Amino acid sequence: KEFGVGLTLEHLTEGHMIANELAKEKFPLAVGPTFGHATKFELQNKTWETPGILAKAGCHVSIITDAPVIPLHPLCAGFAIKAGMDEFDALRAVTINPAEHIGIADRVGSLEEGKDADIVIVDGNPFDVTGVIRHVLIDGKEVE
């Protein structure tokens, strides 16, 4: 804060334990990865409830996976919803919030005129495995 440096708090797998303190600080929070076993001491209390608890406390939450190749974000958002996170908070946690956290929200993260048109259109709930992808657009062009 003293030097005005942008800061994002990463991982926060046990952030639910200090949600009120984190909400006071107003730092962007990147929560995850939540998949896997709690083999490290600092993972003993990780839970899919963490993103929802932090969002309800007023935190600006992104869901992260540490999986650079396989796009697990929708699945992680679905697990967070199942654990009590609001669906719109979960959607924001994998779209506009991460874009804001890394400073590219002027181009991506939401549907607005002038932004990149990277869109997935789903028949059904996008966070439910029964949802069917109908269209994918990258830069406004449909891809097969």
Regions found by a protein language model. Give the residues of each.
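His/Asp/Glu-enriched, well-ordered alpha-helical/loop segment
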Residues: 2, 20-122
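C-terminal cap of metal-dependent C-N hydrolases
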Residues: 100, 112-144
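Charged/polar interaction segments and conserved charged motifs
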Residues: 14, 19-21, 138
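Catalytic beta/alpha-barrel core
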Residues: 6-15, 34, 38-40
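Composition- and surface-driven signal marking solvent-exposed, interaction-prone regions
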Residues: 1, 9-13, 132-135
